[in-house]
Amino acid sequence: MALSFRISSSSPLICRATLSNGDNSRNYHTTDAAFIRRAADLSEMSAGLTSPHPNFGCVIATSSGKVAGEGYLYAQGTKPAEALAVEAAGEFSRGATAYLNMEPGDCHGDHTAVSALVQAGIERVVVGIRHPLQHLRGSAIRELRSHGIEVNVLGEDFESKVLEDARKSCLLVNAPLIHRACSRVPFSVLKYAMTLDGKIAASSGHAAWISSKLSRTRVFELRGGSDAVIVGGNTVRQDDPRLTARHGQGHTPTRIVMTQSLDLPEKANLWDVSEVSTIVVTQRGARKSFQKLLASKGVEVVEFDMLNPREVMEYFHLRGYLSILWECGGTLAASAISSSVIHKVVAFVAPKIIGGSKAPSPVGDLGMVEMTQALNLIDVCYEQVGPDMLVSGFLQPIPDLLPVIPSEDATVEIDPSVDPFEPSIIFFYKTWDLYGMWNITIRYHTTVHVKWYLALSKKHNLLILHPKTLKANKFVGVENPKAYDCVEKIRTARSPEEAALIGRSTLRQKPELVRNDWEDVKIEVMYKALKCKFSTYPHLKSMLLSTIGTVLVEASPHDLFWGGGREGEGLNYLGRLLMQLRSEYLGESSVSAEKTSSA
C-alpha cells in the first residue's frame, strides 16, 4: 500500500494524501509516517541556522488527509514551526492533526509552540521523537495532554516498520543535538572525495578536482549545515583552502585548523577573517611569534597541553559546537577515527583511476592488520551524484534516547559530602543549558540581537530601547552613514545569528565604525539590555529570583570578559551583572513588602 501526494484545488490546502485499499490500521500508520517524514524534511530546510536549537518542522493535516499548513524553524529566535504551520492552516487547524518531527522545544517559560497548537484547536499531535534534552523531555507532551489533546509518540504508542523508518528520519535531522545530550563531543562527519582506486590526490599532491561540480556543490551544502569545518596543517600548506559554504547568505561555518607544530604559511586564505572566523588549535608553546602574527590578523589561537582529536572536540563541545565537518587528510582522519570522535563518514567516489604507490588515501594507518578488524559502517546509503557515487554511513549509531521521565514519587538523595551552607554555582551558556536563556544573544521570536546593535551606536544616551522587542527604535546622531546602514541590517536581521554575523563582519572590515567609548560603556549597556530583556519576560525574572544564594557563571571557555573562561580565569561580567540585577529585584521586592505591611 502506498501513500502519494497530489496538488489540491481547495484553497488554502496544499496537497491531498491518497490511500490505496488495505488494512485501516496499516493505512493509519502509513499516513502518520508520511507526514512525519515531511515534517523531518521541512526541518532540514534551515540546517545550520537553527543551532543551538534543534531542527523543527510541523505539518497540519485534516482528518481527510489533506495538508492544511506547514512550517519550519528558520533560525534560533524566530517564530516556532508550530506557530507558522497553524497560521498557514488558518481555520482548517481546528480538529486537525499536527505532525512534529520532535517534541516542541518550549522552554524557560516560553510556551509559544504549545500555545499555538492549543489555541488553534488541534485535536491530535503525532511526535517523531521526544526532546533529547533531559530538562525539556516530556514537558511539552504533558502540557499538550493536559489541554485534552491526544499525543502519540512514534515507538511508544504504536510501532510498525513504516513508523520506525519515519522515526529514524527524525533522529537523523537532529543527530548533532542528540549526540550532545549523550556525549561530550560534537557530532562529527568525516568527508572526503577519492578516485575509484582509493586516492585523494596524485603522488605529487595535486587534487583539483577529483569529484564533479555537482559533488562539490553537495560539499558546500554539508558545510552550510555544520557549525565548523576542520582541516590539518598539511591541507593548509598544500591546498590553501577557503572552506566557505559559498551560498552567499545564511550560515557560514567556523574554520578550524589543527596543527601540532604550527608550521603554517604566513599567507593563506584561511587567515582572511573578514567574512568568517578561523581558529587554530595547536600544542602549547608552539611558535609564539607566529601565534602573534595570526592574532594580528584576527585569527584565534587555542593552545592544548596534549593536542589530540579527543581533547580538541571536548573543547569545542564546551564552546557549544554541535556539528563538525572534518575535511582533513588521511593522517588526521586516522587519528580522529582512532579517538572515536568520528560518527559518520561521507565519501564521494569518482570514476577515475590515478594510481601511484605514494598517492595518499583518505584514512591513514589505523593499526589494523586483518580484514576482520575493519570498521563496518551502519545505515549505509548510496546515491549517484552526477558521475560520482556518494556513499555514507555511521561509525557510531545515533543514540536512541529512551523517554526517561522522572516519577512524581521519586526522591532525591542528599550527598553528605556537600556543604549545605556553601553557595552553589550555576553555569549557563547555550540555550540547551537549564539556564541558557540568560545569555544575551539568546532571544525569543520577537526580539533582536542587541549586543552588536548597541556597540555600533555613536550616541547611546539618545538610543531608545523598546520594552517589548528589546530593539532600538530610534537612532540619532550617527556620524557615519555606513554605521547607520549596518545598524539597520542588524535591526532587520531574521535571527540573532545573522545579526551577529553582520556585526562581526563589520567590526573586522570597518573597525572605525565602532563607537570610541565602547570599552567604557559596554558594561552599562549590557546591564540595561539585561534589564530590558528580564522586564519583557516575567518568567525569566522569576527564574533569576529562584537562584538566590547561588553564584552565576557564564560558562564560555573563550570569552574572558563576559564569561568565566576555560579554567575559571575569565572575569565573568555577564554572571556578575545578572547577580547585580537579582539583587536589584530583591531590593524592589523588599521595599514593596515593607510598603504593603505599613499600609
UniProtKB/Swiss-Prot annotation:
Membrane-spanning residues: none
UniProt-listed Gene3D superfamilies: Cytidine Deaminase, domain 2 (3.40.140.10), Dihydrofolate Reductase, subunit A (3.40.430.10), YbiA-like (1.10.357.40)
GO MF, one annotated term: diaminohydroxyphosphoribosylaminopyrimidine deaminase activity
Compartments reported by the entry: Plastid, Chloroplast
This enzyme's EC code(s): 1.1.1.193, 3.2.2.-
Pathway: Cofactor biosynthesis; riboflavin biosynthesis; 5-amino-6-(D-ribitylamino)uracil from GTP: step 3/4
Principal subcellular localisation of the protein: plastid
Keywords assigned by UniProt, alphabetized: Chloroplast, Glycosidase, Hydrolase, Multifunctional enzyme, NADP, Oxidoreductase, Plastid, Transit peptide
InterPro entries for the chain: CMP_dCMP_dom, Cytidine_deaminase-like, DHFR-like_dom_sf, Eubact_RibD, NADAR, RibD_C, RibDG_C, Riboflavin_Biosynth_HTPR
The organism's place on the tree of life at top rank: Eukaryota
Catalytic activity: 5-amino-6-(5-phospho-D-ribitylamino)uracil + NADP(+) = 5-amino-6-(5-phospho-D-ribosylamino)uracil + NADPH + H(+); 2,5-diamino-6-hydroxy-4-(5-phosphoribosylamino)-pyrimidine + H2O = 2,5,6-triamino-4-hydroxypyrimidine + D-ribose 5-phosphate; 5-amino-6-(5-phospho-D-ribosylamino)uracil + H2O = 5,6-diaminouracil + D-ribose 5-phosphate
A Pfam family hit: NADAR
One GO term (biological process): riboflavin biosynthetic process
Transit peptide as recorded in UniProt: 1-17
GO cellular component: chloroplast
Family: In the C-terminal section; belongs to the YbiA family.
Note: Unlike bacteria that have a bifunctional, two-domain RibD enzyme, plants have a monofunctional reductase and a monofunctional deaminase, each having an enzymatically inactive domain.
Entry note about domains: The C-terminal domain (416-599) is not required for the reductase activity while the non-functional deaminase domain (21-150) is necessary.
Record PANTHER family: 2,5-DIAMINO-6-RIBOSYLAMINO-4(3H)-PYRIMIDINONE 5'-PHOSPHATE REDUCTASE, DIHYDROFOLATE REDUCTASE FAMILY PROTEIN (AFU_ORTHOLOGUE AFUA_8G06820)
The protein's role, per its UniProt record: Pyrimidine reductase involved in the riboflavin biosynthesis pathway. Also has a non-functional N-terminal deaminase domain that lacks the catalytically essential zinc-binding residues. Catalyzes the hydrolysis of the N-glycosidic bond in the first two intermediates of riboflavin biosynthesis, which are highly reactive metabolites, yielding relatively innocuous products. Thus, can divert a surplus of harmful intermediates into relatively harmless products and pre-empt the damage these intermediates would otherwise do. Helps maintain flavin levels. Has no activity against GTP, nucleoside monophosphates or ADP-ribose.
Protein name in the entry: Riboflavin biosynthesis protein PYRR, chloroplastic
Organism the protein comes from: Arabidopsis thaliana (Mouse-ear cress)
